[in-house]
Amino acid sequence: MKLEYRYSIILALLLLAQMLMACTDNAKNTEIALVSDNTVNIGYGGGEELVKFICYDKWTISSDVSWITFDSPTEGNGNAIIKIRVEKNTSGEDRMGKLSIACGGNIEIIEIKQSVKTIDIGHKHPSILYTREELLNIKRMVEANSSASVTTTYNNLMTRCNNALNYTAAPYTGQDPTKFIEESYIPGSNSRDLALAYWFTQDKKYARKSVEIIETWAKACRDISYVADAGSAMYLTRGMYPMVCAYDMLVTEDVMSDETKKNITDWFHVLYREGMISINLWESNDYFNKQYYQNHLVAHSMGILMLGLATDNDELIQFAIDSPANPRDVYELLSGCIFMDGDTPCSREKAGSASPVKGEIYDRYRHDTGPLKGLQYTHLTLTLLSTTARMCYNNGLDLFAYTAPTGENLRYCFEYYSDFYRTMDSCIKSGYYCGETERMTKAGDNPGMYEMGLRYYPDSEPVRQLISSGTFNRESSYMDLLGYTRFLSAEIND
């Protein structure tokens, strides 16, 4: 799955290895210089992988299993980039095959380890932001006026949507991911909100406008390759999520043609292409100065997961949630991003800082490196983790109830950080975030996101105290990523 995005790096490494070997021995060298790892992990879906080595003699390569085949010559001389093809694993258990590389009298072994499918998702639309059942429940609540706050939120939504009917999409067609997300906020929010308006009113004018916005962006942007930097896939994921949600809400509603669906999903596949580039870029650069579990990495798997759900692709879903081929899959992110008492923080934190406690989030180090952005970035990480968990929950995998082998659970994060937004005091608890009070809620860290905490942890006293504190207006609380946050907890009708 990593094939096409590493070619230039691979060739450079091969040339470097060749130069080093030539400098150390002018005679024929029959040692094998591996550029590939000795062990290669492949997801259950299989696919293509590159094996790289240098040999200054004739060489051969072979496999000891039938499920690994070669798309390249199996013998040659000198530099070698061998494309192997691994079949989907339908055996029901993890398996391993061995590649044997013979060069002169030397042999090197590469182990190919392939996992089994562990994630069974019940595909349904909609499910990425809301399920059909949730949408119909909100519609019933509005019609019955059974919740004043939900009704007021609905009225706010419809005001936005009626204005959005006059909106004309103007897609950003440059290659800068930062500008992409900036330009996507309004069209993304409009498309998602209009899709909601369609569900609540059944008036197709809202659906048609939503689809028009998405398809305009799809046609303009589907062939763009973005500048590969540390933020590329993160910005694309966050920018595209609302439009993916809108598509998910409308794809089964007889409001778009097959051609339109193809135009849109062809564009959505940028999430995989750019996601894989970013995953590889972060891994090969030691996570850009040892930022091992932070919001960018959550966004990488979140983007591939939402693409998999939008297109009913089990292999992408498995890769995002639980795959040895993904160095930061969702399960690893849950255990890595969430601290337990005594965990080792990011090495970029200042020496002598208060030790992390249960429920804190790895991105807190932004208090030191931001500076004074610890609460902003822990909120972002929690938002992305929770949005990812909600997608899984809506498709039958409850990650809100999941506790990692080392004890981490999303509930701890909601409960730890809710007190900061209830008191609006960054100096409480350990004092680590002291100095951030003036910035709280001003950089996207909307307390309304805790409606998601209320939805999945309705018995949590800290979360309930925040929701009822009056710190934020529940009816008007709005996030570019999620829209009106009150709808997220509509089932908890207090």
Regions found by a protein language model. Give the residues of each.
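Bacterial N-terminal signal peptides that target proteins for export
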Residues: 1-10
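Bacterial Sec-dependent N-terminal signal peptides
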Residues: 13, 18-39, 103-121
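Solvent-exposed, low-complexity, repeat-rich "mucin-like" stalks and linkers
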Residues: 25-28, 33-62
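Short, solvent-exposed loop/turn segments enriched in Ser/Thr/Gly
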Residues: 45-51, 90-98
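Surface-exposed binding patches on compact interaction domains or structured appendages
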Residues: 54-83
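A short beta-strand micro-motif common to beta-rich folds, especially ectodomain repeats
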Residues: 82, 92-105
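Extracellular glycan-targeting catalytic surfaces
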Residues: 118-290, 298, 302, 321-328, ...
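Flexible internal linker/loop segments at domain or repeat junctions
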Residues: 334-370
